[in-house]
Amino acid sequence: MPVKLRWPWLGIAIPTFLISFIGYGAHYFILSNFLSVPKQITFEFCLSMIWLSYYLAICTNPGRPLPNYKPPPDIWRNFCKKCQSYKPERSHHCKTCNQCVLMMDHHCPWTMNCVGFANYPHFLRFLFWIIVTTSVLFCIQAKRIYFIWQQRHLPGYFFKKSELIFLTISSPLNSFVLLTITILFLRCLFNQILNGRSQIESWDMDRLESLFNSGRLTQKLIDNTWRIYPESRSFQNKKDAEEHLTKKRPRFDELVNFPYDFDLYTNALLYLGPIHLWLWPYGVPTGDGNNFPKNGISKYEANSSLEDHILSLPWPPDGGKTNTVFNHGSSTIEMRNESGEQLIRTRLPQNGRHASREKWYNDWGESLDDFGVDVDME
């Protein structure tokens, strides 16, 4: 779950302290005692790249919609009352930054800024350089600790007391930073590069799957298809729709397509820019963040099947609105497809799991509000 700080300035103060304490403290008390000058310079270079990437992640605006933006006909028309303009696809209004953010990923407390289309490469490079620097330091500290342990029978004056104290303090602290940032970095790669999604869009995908498993999504998708593509309401498609609702139980991936996901390399080029600029501190993503290319599955073809029409719906395919719950007293009907058999069971409603999009939360306890989104503007 995203961290919420009582005093927002701590979001900058804590990382600044950790970078300074671990980085410069390790250099002064440990590395300067035995490491060669070229290796010390390399370490300081990595440390400087952390500072530069961090500064850019903090100070770079995550991206705001173009003035007088008009949405194309193939996306939902979402009007932001606070900005008094339409929101481009994948955009959300941040309640902290008080602006609509292009391809909003989340509001980061550690940068006091949103992570969005324009500064996502800076944020990812910031994480990358932390991992590189702490990994190098971890290896150096491990070798140094092993060396001191081998010489433990020597008199104490052979080693500086300050080095031993700092090794004791900084080694576990550095390992903790390395572990946590690596997990965050891998999550970013998994969401954005592997699946082409922001954290909010991954959350939305979980929400849609929850709606699908509870039997409340299919009807909404069919209704949206009739509304957006009225010409697709043929006799055969109506028959297929009835079968989906009463007999045939399609898989989730047969009805829901994330339109902005391509292969891994294309996703990386889209969000990080050309490959030769991935490590360049000022590298920017491809495009303007107001319009995004879509995969072939999302292309609408009038003569296609009902499933193809549903897959071509704009994101999110339910329009961001939750369909009516099929309630029977105080319970909820859930339908699942296991091993080719349709299972129907009655479940007691779970607080928050069958709520509207603005109040729904995932298995991590994350709601739309936790990502910094102004839910009143959704």
From Swiss-Prot:
GO terms for molecular function: palmitoyltransferase activity; protein-cysteine S-palmitoyltransferase activity. The active site is at residue 108. Mediates the reversible addition of palmitate to target proteins, thereby regulating their membrane association and biological function. Palmitoylates several amino acid permeases. Palmitoylates chitin synthase CHS3, which is required for its proper export from the ER. Can palmitoylate RAS2 in vitro. Residues 78-128 form the DHHC domain. It is a multi-pass membrane protein. The gene is PFA4. The chain crosses the membrane at residues 10-30, 41-61, 120-140, 165-185. The keyword Transmembrane applies. Belongs to the DHHC palmitoyltransferase family. PFA4 subfamily. This is Palmitoyltransferase PFA4. It comes from the Eukaryota. Its EC number is 2.3.1.225. The DHHC domain is required for palmitoyltransferase activity. Residues 31-40, 141-164 are lumenal. It catalyses: L-cysteinyl-[protein] + hexadecanoyl-CoA = S-hexadecanoyl-L-cysteinyl-[protein] + CoA. One of its GO terms (cellular component) is endoplasmic reticulum. Disruption phenotype: Leads to the retention of non-palmitoylated CHS3 in the endoplasmic reticulum and reduced levels of chitin on the cell wall. Keywords: Acyltransferase, Endoplasmic reticulum, Lipoprotein, Membrane, Palmitate, Transferase, Transmembrane, Transmembrane helix. PANTHER family: PALMITOYLTRANSFERASE ZDHHC16. InterPro entries: Palmitoyltrfase_DHHC, PFA4, PFA4/ZDH16/20/ERF2-like. GO terms for biological process: protein palmitoylation; protein targeting to membrane. It is found in: Endoplasmic reticulum membrane. Residues 1-9, 62-119, 186-378 are cytoplasmic. Disulfide bonds: none annotated. Autopalmitoylated.
